[in-house]
Each structure stands twice: as C-alpha cells, then as structure tokens.
Amino acid sequence: MQELYNPKEIEKKFQTNWDENQSFKATEDPSKEKYYCLSMFPYPSGKLHMGHVRNYTIGDVISRYQRMQGKNVMQPMGWDAFGLPAENAAIKNNTAPAGWTYENIAYMKTQLKQLGFGYDWSRELATCQPEYYRWEQWFFTKLVEKDLVYKKMATVNWDPVDQTVLANEQVIDGRGWRSGALVEQKEIPQWFIKITAYAQELLDDLDKLDEWPEQVRTMQRNWIGRSEGVEMDFKVSGKEESFSVYTTRPDTVMGVTYVAVAAQHPLALEAAKNNPTLAAFCKKCKNVKLAEAEIATMAKEGVDTGFKAIHPISGLEVPIWTANFVLMGYGSGAVMSVPAHDQRDYEFAKKYDLTIKAVIKPANTDLDISVEAYTEKGVCFDSGEFDGLDFSAAFDAVETKLVAENKGKRQVNFRLRDWGVSRQRYWGTPIPMLNLEDGSVVPVPENELPVILPEDVQMNGIVSPIKADPDWAKTTYNGQPATHETDTFDTFMESSWYYARYCSPQSDDAMLDPEKANYWLPVDQYIGGIEHAILHLLYSRFFHKLLRDFGLVDCDEPYKKLLTQGMVLADAYYYEDAKGGKVWIAPTDVETETDEKGKVISAATKDGQTVIYDGMSKMSKSKNNGVDPQVMIDKYGADSVRLFMMFAAPADQTLEWSDSALEGSLRFLKRLWKIAFDHLALGAVADLDLKSHTEAQKTLRRELHKTIAKVTDDIGRRQTFNTAIASVMELMNKLTKTATKTEQDRAILQEALLAITKLLAPITPHICAELFEVLGQTEEILNAPWPTVDESALVEDSKLIVVQVNGKLRAKLTVAADAQQETVQAIAMENENVSKFTDGKTIRKIIFVPGKLLNIVAN
C-alpha cells in the first residue's frame, strides 16, 4: 500500500475494472429479490452540472447499498434527447441538432463514468433514436384505435413576422425571441390524449403512494382538482339558445346578479360584431395568453355584451358580460357571478357598478359585505324556498329542483385538462398520423413504423425542416396520396415511459417484454427534482396506467418510492452596466472580504471591478454561478465530490456549495487512508478473541457496532445520508484516540476498518474498494455483504451512573449493567462526595433511572 492517497490513480483503476467486467450489468433472476433504482435521466445539454451530480450520487449510493443487502439491483441510464435547446444550439452553431446531441451524450457519458456511477450501460437508450420512438408512435396509434386520442383547435403563440409557432420559452416580454414582433394567440388543430378519462384513478391511487413526499402528492391532488358541484343551464333572453355554467356553490344561486363569459365565447363573438368596444376588448384578450396564477393577480376587466340571461330558478333577467378572467379552455367558458359571495365577482361588480345581492349569512353573527365578499359557507336567506338551509341541504335542494325542471344536474369536475401533445417543432418524435385527400385522418399503418425524423437537416430558426420540405410529408395510404403529420410530440411523451423501456431496451419486436417488465417494475426508488412533481410524474403515472390497460405491465403505479433532492446553491456576484443591466461574474473570478462570521463585506473581480454580492442562489447559466463538476473531479477526485454531495446537507434539502467543505471531504479520505496505512505498516493482524477483551476494548467494539446499526438505519430506512457519514466520522475520531498497543487492539481496528470501508463503499466506492483489497480481502467489495451488527457487542457488562444530590452532580459510578436501585443506592451512599452532602439530612425522595441516573433529594 502506498503511503499517500492518490484518488486519480485509484479511481481510474476501479472504473476500468468495472467497465471491463460489466460489474453493474443486471439480468432477471427470479430467485433473488429485485431492486430497481432510477434517477431521472438528463437532457444532453453539453456537460453535467452539479444538480445532475447530486441527483446521480444519491441514486448510486442507494443502488450500491441495496446490492450489498444481497438484492438484484438494476440502475440504468439514458438520455432525454429531444427538445428545443438542441434546435436553438443548432441554429447558433449552424449545425444539425442530431450531431450536437450525440456529441453531448458522448461527453456526458464520460463524465458519469468518471464519477464512478454503477450504471448498466448495456441498457442505455436515447429518446431521439428510431428504435426508441418507434414504439411511442406504435402506442399512440393504439390509443387512437381505443378512442383515447382526438384533434381539436387549440391556442398557440404565433410570431406573425417569422410565420411560426413559438414555445412559451421563446416569448420574451410578449415578443418573439428572434423577430421581436408582438406575439399573437392563434388557434390551430392539435392532438390531445384523454388523460381526463383517468383523472379519478390518478387521484385515488395517490393514496397508494405512501412512500412519496406528501408535498408532491398534495401538488398532484391540487392539479387534478376534483370538485363536486352542479351544472345548470341559463337561457339567453330573446333567443332559442342556452349555455351551461358549473358551480361548486349552488347554495348561492339566488345571489347571481350577472353572468361572465370568455372573450372567445360564441355569445361574446356574436355581440362583438355590432359593438366596436367589445370587439377591441375580445381582440385584446385573445392576444394575451394567461396562466391561472396570472389571472388571479391581474386587473379584472370586462365589457357588457348587451345580452341578458334568464335565471334558471327565479326567471329574472341578469346581464351577460365578457370578462378577461374567464377562459374558454376551462369548463364551458361561462361562469355565474355572485358578487356578494365571491371576491373576484365582488371586485368586478364594484368596478362596473353591478348589483350585489347577499344570500348567505353566518349562522351566529351579522353579515358585513361593505368592504369584501362573504365567501364562507353559512345559511341561506333572501333565497325564497331555500331560506334557512345550510350549505349541504341547499346544495341538495337546488340540485333536486334543477333536475326536476330539466335545467341542471349534479356533476363531478376536474381541473385537469386533456394532454395536448402536438408541438410545431422539428427536434421531436413525428406524430404517426396521415392526412388523406378526403379530409380524413388515419394512423400510420404498423408495418410503416417508425416514421423517421430526418437528422441531416439545415436549421434556419424560422420553420421546422420537416414542415419546410413538402417531399418529406408526401406518402401514400392504400394506394391513395396522403401526407404525414408534420407536428412532433411534446417531449414529455418520451420521458413518460422510458423507465419501462429500460427493462427490455433491446426488444425490437415489442414496446416492452412483459416478462422482463413485470420482473423489474415498479421502480423501487425514483430520484429527481421537485420541479417535476406535477407534469412529468403525472404524465408518467398516466402512461403507466395506459400500458397496464394494454396488458404490457401488471402493476398500477410506475414508482414505488420517490426522493426529491434539493437544489444546489452557490454564491452569485454581479455589477451593473451602463444601461443598468446586471452582468453576472463567476465566483471563481471574484475576491471577497468577509467579517468574523464569514459574511461578505466587499467583493471585487481580480482586475479590481467592484461587484455586488447577491447571496446564495440556484446554480444557473443565467447567474454564471455554476461550478464545473469536471474541474472538481480533476482537483479533488470523484470520491471527495461524492462525499461532499452526500454530507453537506440532507438529500431532500438545498445544498450550499463550498470549496472549503469539499477540501474537508478530501482531508477526511486522506485521514482514513493514513489510519489504514499506519495499521498495515505494523504487519499481520491476529484474529479477534472476544473473551480476552478489556473494558476499553469492549467499549470500542460497542461503538463500532452501534455505528453499523445507525448507518444501516440512516441509509436504508431514513435516507439521512449526511447523518450516516457523521456517525462514521465520530467512530474514526474514537479510533484515532485509542492506542493500538496490543494484538487485540489491532484486531479490533482491523474489524473497524473493514466495517468502515463497507459502510462508506456506496458513498466513496473507489477508495473503499482499494482499502478493502489492501486490508486482505479477496472478494470484491461490490459483492461483499453489508456489515452486520454483533448484538452481543452491544450488551454492556457495566454502566456509568450519574449520582446527583438535589440535582447537582456529586459522583459518577461504574456499576453492573443490571444493577437494581438498592445496589446503586448502597454504593452511592458509601461514596465520600455523596455522603458529604447527605449526612445529617433527611432523604425525602430518590429518583432512579436504570443505567443512567440516581438523584437524591435531601434537606
């Protein structure tokens, strides 16, 4: 064993060894308990960032730990390779997205290997490869056959200068990112998958996911947004037509004083023909794409359509207004407005001087709606036949009346909308549909799949190459001319089923091999960022249920246990340019002055430019505060980087980057190396002889086995990896303070070092593999079993008892571990320092905590 720890040399040795031996190749073995550990696959953007490193280190630690538990572990890796950034990079670098993507994959794969991650590379997949996306296309055609897919008009961002559809990210302050033109909202036909058909099951099955963070389950529940209410019909005065509204508060129906419709509602569009003010308002609303969150905070505006609606119960007329807070895509595009009992309706009514009629009051206090709406549930009044009814009774009574008069019904609604999967981009999976000359649309026949995306293309940044090339779209169907759909799939499609494809990635005659899929699925542990809590995880759960219903998998859910790792933060610095814009400077180019508490007082670039410290924020390109993992691996070694990632913070919380803490990780590993070197330098080690051990030796072994028990629980059950590492550090401190004079001292140290290498092996695998070897072990640490706790070592022959008199420490006694109160009391009373404070006094009370404390109360 060499004296100095050389991470580069050791890491290269074992990475080569693992690669050549395919040490992490997984095969189905029904005789062993399987464990499928998966980290969310990366987008191949160019190089790994520290968020990736944290995510993948956590996954690798769990995988290696489970392998040492004797399980058959699969940990695959692949590439979420389609998407807009590749198009943007291709335009910028005047290249095709495919080449850029494959180059990035090659580089990032090298980085992953340098970090020692134990992936089964034989299962590697990239979603941009036809052998992957052909099955996505095939499955989509099956969904079409089952009537789970439809096409309808939907709104997109349209750049009128570039004549192209823009992704939300390409709209900057309402303008196209390239042309600078004001972006319009345009309706075009798009494909949708009926996720709403599974809304109830997606909601119900969240209860099965008891190993998911409650925060994620709550976010999904809210996104699905189940509500129970009443749908009722309002007739339009003087017309044959009627329209429906949905409400969760039918108890307030007698307080409706106006109805609000979306700017794109047929009634609004009809009224706008003869009303220039309304027409201008509708146009303004059309060109503003709003999320629900923005609607909640924006100024409420509207225009009277001039139409009146007939109240379904009172028969009274109420005005119909067009309002900017009603969206055509939600419900019927019309809402009943009860300003006395809804704050948004209240603000609108106040602004436009509309009637406010109160119909609900608190049970035991006076009603006051002078400054805001009363939105709580209460008792009906001024509501005719519903007076005196509470919420529940009024709900039922209103529903019963509407149903009897054929004007409404009870209904369950979901906030969840069907999944729009069309994208007007190039770098994605072509949607496998054909347009025929008679206007009909049919799926591409199975024997013509995949519809291959051409990779050798020129990107002009304006229009998708497959939309620009009429020859690409031309094809035939049953001998008739046809054209291919030129839209591509939302990239969430690829990431919705990749976890299942890993089970049989080479399968070329089926989407999944059911036998293999049912052996490995569900994923036992999934790791990824909280930002994917809703869309990716919800779409993936939906896709899994589709796979199940097509007989491809047996289980109901894709991911059994979920860990959402925290972000990686770093210091951020900037100065303001002449226009007041922020110019962000990399922390490595900044020199700082700090106070005694480490707080930054002043900062400047190395050439003297004063900069402002912006605190810690998420590592990002925009703030130029990312740390290149490659630089850290080269400087400190992969094991030090991995150790820092697992020790600096609990896995599910934010991690603050610190170069000095990373140096501390390297120091710790050097210390472990030195303890092993000094130990081995003394020559051969005797076997443990438990019977001959002194109290001090028994105590040290007890500490060792307590540590094994704690680390096992911390990693295996609690997933508090940082406290597991802290326990090993404490044990090492005790080992270094213990003299190794005798044969048995060294035998215990040998046992401890072997245990420590195993305990740390999932976290710092390279150094532990080397130490395990030099400590005389013939098997590879990869295949070594996790250390077991020697229960007999935990049994204490004696205990240290604290003796207090009137709450003050007077003695510490070593007594037999099973000593009863009488024995401990007798020994304590003979102690000189105890008797000094009890002689001549009356003992009023004795408090005894077995094995810990004796407190004598005397006066």
UniProtKB/Swiss-Prot annotation:
<dbReference type="Pfam" id="PF08264">
    <property type="entry name" value="Anticodon_1"/>
</dbReference>
<keyword id="KW-0030">Aminoacyl-tRNA synthetase</keyword>
<keyword id="KW-0436">Ligase</keyword>
<dbReference type="GO" id="GO:0002161">
    <property type="term" value="F:aminoacyl-tRNA deacylase activity"/>
</dbReference>
<dbReference type="GO" id="GO:0004823">
    <property type="term" value="F:leucine-tRNA ligase activity"/>
</dbReference>
<dbReference type="InterPro" id="IPR015413">
    <property type="entry name" value="Methionyl/Leucyl_tRNA_Synth"/>
</dbReference>
<dbReference type="InterPro" id="IPR009080">
    <property type="entry name" value="tRNAsynth_Ia_anticodon-bd"/>
</dbReference>
<dbReference type="InterPro" id="IPR001412">
    <property type="entry name" value="aa-tRNA-synth_I_CS"/>
</dbReference>
<dbReference type="InterPro" id="IPR002300">
    <property type="entry name" value="aa-tRNA-synth_Ia"/>
</dbReference>
<feature type="short sequence motif" description="'HIGH' region">
    <location>
        <begin position="42"/>
        <end position="52"/>
    </location>
</feature>
<dbReference type="GO" id="GO:0006429">
    <property type="term" value="P:leucyl-tRNA aminoacylation"/>
</dbReference>
<dbReference type="InterPro" id="IPR009008">
    <property type="entry name" value="Val/Leu/Ile-tRNA-synth_edit"/>
</dbReference>
<keyword id="KW-0067">ATP-binding</keyword>
<dbReference type="Pfam" id="PF00133">
    <property type="entry name" value="tRNA-synt_1"/>
</dbReference>
<dbReference type="InterPro" id="IPR014729">
    <property type="entry name" value="Rossmann-like_a/b/a_fold"/>
</dbReference>
<feature type="short sequence motif" description="'KMSKS' region">
    <location>
        <begin position="618"/>
        <end position="622"/>
    </location>
</feature>
<keyword id="KW-0547">Nucleotide-binding</keyword>
<protein>
    <recommendedName>
        <fullName>Leucine--tRNA ligase</fullName>
        <ecNumber>6.1.1.4</ecNumber>
    </recommendedName>
</protein>
<dbReference type="InterPro" id="IPR002302">
    <property type="entry name" value="Leu-tRNA-ligase"/>
</dbReference>
<dbReference type="InterPro" id="IPR025709">
    <property type="entry name" value="Leu_tRNA-synth_edit"/>
</dbReference>
<keyword id="KW-0963">Cytoplasm</keyword>
<keyword id="KW-0648">Protein biosynthesis</keyword>
<dbReference type="InterPro" id="IPR013155">
    <property type="entry name" value="M/V/L/I-tRNA-synth_anticd-bd"/>
</dbReference>
<dbReference type="GO" id="GO:0005829">
    <property type="term" value="C:cytosol"/>
</dbReference>
<dbReference type="Pfam" id="PF13603">
    <property type="entry name" value="tRNA-synt_1_2"/>
</dbReference>
<dbReference type="GO" id="GO:0005524">
    <property type="term" value="F:ATP binding"/>
</dbReference>
<dbReference type="Pfam" id="PF09334">
    <property type="entry name" value="tRNA-synt_1g"/>
</dbReference>
<feature type="binding site">
    <location>
        <position position="621"/>
    </location>
    <ligand>
        <name>ATP</name>
    </ligand>
</feature>
<comment type="similarity">
    <text>Belongs to the class-I aminoacyl-tRNA synthetase family.</text>
</comment>
